[in-house]
Swiss-Prot record:
InterPro entries: Glyco_hydro_1, Glyco_hydro_1_AS, Glyco_hydro_1_N_CS, Glycoside_hydrolase_SF. Can hydrolyze salicin, cellobiose, and probably arbutin. Keywords: Glycosidase, Hydrolase. Gene3D superfamilies: Glycosidases. The keyword Hydrolase applies. Its EC number is 3.2.1.86. Pfam families: Glyco_hydro_1 (PF00232). This is 6-phospho-beta-glucosidase AscB. NCBIfam families: PRK09593.1 (NF007158), PRK09852.1 (NF007356). It is an enzyme of class 3 (hydrolase). It catalyses: 6-phospho-beta-D-glucosyl-(1->4)-D-glucose + H2O = D-glucose 6-phosphate + D-glucose.
Length: 474
């Protein structure tokens, strides 16, 4: 008998900014991700260190066409249904509904598109799990308001959220507010549209922007419950706990501090108040949070569940050695000598998933939802035209087993959506060659290819996993 409950939501995940393409169709406005190029300038732009407010003819922007989900969503959702998906996680591009972000009324073409996507899901009995903001702030809000450093974005986001909850009521009941909200600290332009001026206190800017996002998230949660009490709203963490690099007490403390840095956002979203440790963190970083009257009351609108991504665990030491570092999901870490690594240097640690889940449930006592997990790898066609991605099957098998162990530990896990179920553009590198999917998309790092979809060996394996409710993993 399977350890997974009968109601368990098996599926996969994509994101608008990495799969839709059609970046100017349907009156869509430009977003932050549309300004992030492939190549040598990518990281500086993502970090908010290089200002890019105009597109350049000499640069390639992977998100502009991506994998063309905008025109091929029916084909892609049919492939998901063939695998037996119970849930499909995707996101709404804010600028498809509000091209500039600050309009009073939404763009009906955007609403019609997403309604059609969600209706297609429901046709196959697939529940949409929808992220409101997945690394794509409308560029007008960046250039005119300074993005999330400006309190006005709370108002704009609340209007956008209400529009979504009302327009898609009856089609969507599972919602996430901000994707990997803690990534703002590590990739500020990607996470929050932040661009820094020379000499300013970047920590002050990031944590003030974080406060605005946390208030906006809590308001959205409140609005969702007002529109339909059946709506369930979650937060979303870039997960993966930190191990101390040694049993040296200073390393243990360094790991605790790193965990707190990442969990700070979820502490607020799940508990409804700023954690006690944040006062000292802010003091030492020279940060003063400017709160509006009523903010503390708004923050009490906590999420219904805690969702997270998990790709790898991390290591921390009091003495971080740059020569022994890696960056799993843009979060800096020391290399763990006990782990094998992926093609991109991310440590493979299934037990770390079980550890992370236990830690998070102990901390929050709310249902968990693993909404991103997978192996980025280079896939090649065999002579017979097949893609035998046994390495991906092995990775997923061991992580599903770890999930099962966590459920046996007593943790309520709502579901599991593998990342990039159909190949997409990598958010971190902008590459297509870093593939996660059960379905291969014919497109290369330079944007060439037919976009033809091809089922990989893992497609048939995952179909079997879902059909057996996680019991048949061979």
């Amino acid at each position: 008998m399977s350890v997974f409950p009968e109601s368990f939501l098996w599926g996969g995940a994509l994101a608008a900014n990495q799969s839709e393409g059609a970046f100017r169709e349907g009156d869509k406005g430009l977003t932050t991700v549309d300004m992030i190029p492939h190549g040598e300038h990518r990281m500086a732009v993502k970090l908010g260190l290089e200002k890019r407010f105009q597109l350049r003819d000499d640069e390639f922007y992977p998100s502009h066409e991506a994998t063309d989900f905008y025109h091929r969503y029916k084909e892609d959702i049919a492939l998901m249904a063939e695998m037996g998906f119970k849930v499909f996680r995707t996101s709404i591009a804010w600028s498809r509904l509000f091209p500039q972000g600050d309009e009073i009324t939404p763009n009906q073409q955007g609403i019609a598109f997403y309604r059609s996507v969600f209706e297609e899901c429901k046709k196959y009995g697939i529940e949409p799990l929808v992220t409101l903001c997945h690394f794509d702030v409308p560029m007008h809000l960046v250039t005119e308001y300074g993005s999330w450093r400006n309190r006005k974005l709370v108002e704009f986001f609340s209007r956008y959220a209400r529009t979504c909850f009302e327009a898609f009521d009856g089609l969507v009941k599972y919602w996430l507010t901000f994707n990997e909200i803690n990534i703002m600290l590590h990739s500020p332009f990607s996470g929050a549209g932040l661009v820094f001026e020379e000499g300013e206190n970047q920590d002050q800017v990031k944590y003030q922007a974080a406060h605005h996002q946390l208030v906006a998230s809590a308001l959205a949660t409140k609005i969702a419950h007002e529109v339909n009490p059946q709506n369930q709203v979650g937060c979303m963490l870039a997960g993966g706990n930190f191990y101390p690099y040694s049993c040296k007490p200073e390393d243990v403390w360094a790991a605790l501090e790193k965990d707190r840095e990442n969990l700070f956002f979820i502490d607020v979203q799940a508990r409804g108040t700023y954690p006690a440790y944040s006062a000292r963190v802010f003091r030492e970083k020279g940060v003063t949070i400017n709160k509006a009257p009523g903010d503390d009351e708004i923050l009490k609108n906590t999420v219904d569940f805690v969702s997270f991504s998990y790709y790898a665990s991390r290591c921390a030491s009091a003495e971080m050695n740059a020569n022994n570092s890696s960056a799993a999901n843009v979060v800096k870490s020391l290399r763990n000598p006990y782990l094998q690594v992926s093609d991109w240097g991310w440590g493979i640690d299934p037990l770390g998933l079980r550890i992370t889940m236990n830690m998070m449930y102990d901390r929050y006592q709310k249902p968990l939802f693993l909404v991103e997990n997978g192996l980025g790898a280079k896939d090649e066609f065999a002579a017979n035209g097949e893609i035998n991605d046994d390495y991906r099957i092995s990775y997923l098998r061991e992580h599903i087993r770890a999930m099962g162990e966590a459920i046996a530990d007593g943790i309520p896990l709502m579901g599991y959506t593998t990342w990039g179920c159909i190949d997409l553009v990598s958010a971190s590198t902008g590459e297509m060659s870093k593939r996660y999917g059960f379905v291969f998309v014919d497109r290369d790092d330079a944007g060439n290819g037919t976009l033809t979809r091809t089922r990989k060996k893992s497609f048939w394996w995952y179909k079997k996993v879902i059909a057996s409710n996680g019991e048949d993993l061979e």
